[in-house]
Amino acid sequence: MSWSRVIAYGLLPGLALALTCGAGLLKWQDGAVRDAAVARAESVRAATDGTTALLSYRPDTVQHDLESARSRLTGTFLDAYTQLTHDVVIPGAQQKQISAVATVAAAASVSTSADRAVVLLFVNQTITVGKDAPTTAASSVRVTLDNINGRWLISQFEPI
């Protein structure tokens, strides 16, 4: 058997197969990296928007504001938030004319998978009680989100 036949019928097809497999592996890895980057960006955005909604309200619209924020929550945190807002926050805001405006100064992804993410937020909140001068507080919050039906929902909210 001649070497040209060995190369033509053995080595070249094997090399082509190896290159095809390598290209497929690289394509798969590229897709996984892109999916992770998208999940990271979406979860940070959801944590930022959700935190702003959870911590911002005006006395005349507090019920609507905080009820709307509930759509960004899930699990036991949804239950705890609902109880706290109905029992404490809404009545207090209406009686004492309390308004709050929260802004996220910085946000960073701590960890992200396809169905769960943890985001660290640095939050500034300005609170006004009646006609008193506003007070500002800064805090750090660790937000855990679950990806449910394609939506990132807050499942834990831990001040740190």
Curated annotation (Swiss-Prot):
Signal peptide interval:
1-22
Q: Sorted alphabetically, which keywords does the UniProt record give? A: Cell outer membrane, Membrane, Signal
Q: Which cysteines are joined by disulfide bonds?
A: none
Write down the superkingdom of origin: Bacteria
CC annotations in GO: cell outer membrane
Give the chief site where it resides.
Answer: membrane
The record's subcellular locations are: Cell outer membrane
Q: Which PANTHER family match?
A: OUTER MEMBRANE PROTEIN RV1973 (PTHR37042:SF4)
The protein's name in its UniProt record: Outer membrane protein MT2024.1
Question: What organism does this protein naturally occur in?
Answer: Mycobacterium tuberculosis (strain CDC 1551 / Oshkosh)
Lineage from the top down?
Bacteria, Bacillati, Actinomycetota, Actinomycetes, Mycobacteriales
